[in-house]
Amino acid sequence: MSAQTPFSKQDVRLIPKPLWGFSLASLCVASSWNIVRDEALTSSGSQCRFRCLPGRHDGTLEAHERWSYDQSGTVTLQEIWPLCRNCHELFHPGRTLAHSGQAGLDRLTRRYAAAAGVERREAQRRYAAAFHSHSIASKIQRWTIDTSLVSPHFPLKAKRAKLASLGLHSWNPYPFADAILASPNA
């Protein structure tokens, strides 16, 4: 799977709140996702793309979905990165904060700084910028999902959507919001 954007250790993106729980893996049936995942992992030579500190890899590769989120409410799949579990955590500071609190985020920030080759203050700034972008994007309630990176190459059968396949798909995490707002009694 060729990269549309260069790999960047510095670019951390948090998932907007309305899209929590959403992923290509969660939208596809297992057979479709496994094809995409396996291609991403084997195209990297079954190695972690991040290749951070020696001895930090546990040998298990995970497929990290790289999405871009724009102000118009379009979420676009850009790339799938094979990452070891330890490196994968570096790109999910929101999850770490939710599960381990500020102490966990502080530990993650130190690891991120070492792996990215930056000072701790710079790592904190990058995570803060990601949290700021997250708060803005989380205000958008309707999202259009663009999986065109993989859908022309792999048949993606939808699991959660009421579509036979995925490509461009509107996602409304609150499907009854329009009915409630349109109700004459509201």
Describe each PLM feature range.
Residues 1-38, 52-57, 102-186:
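A boundary/linker detector
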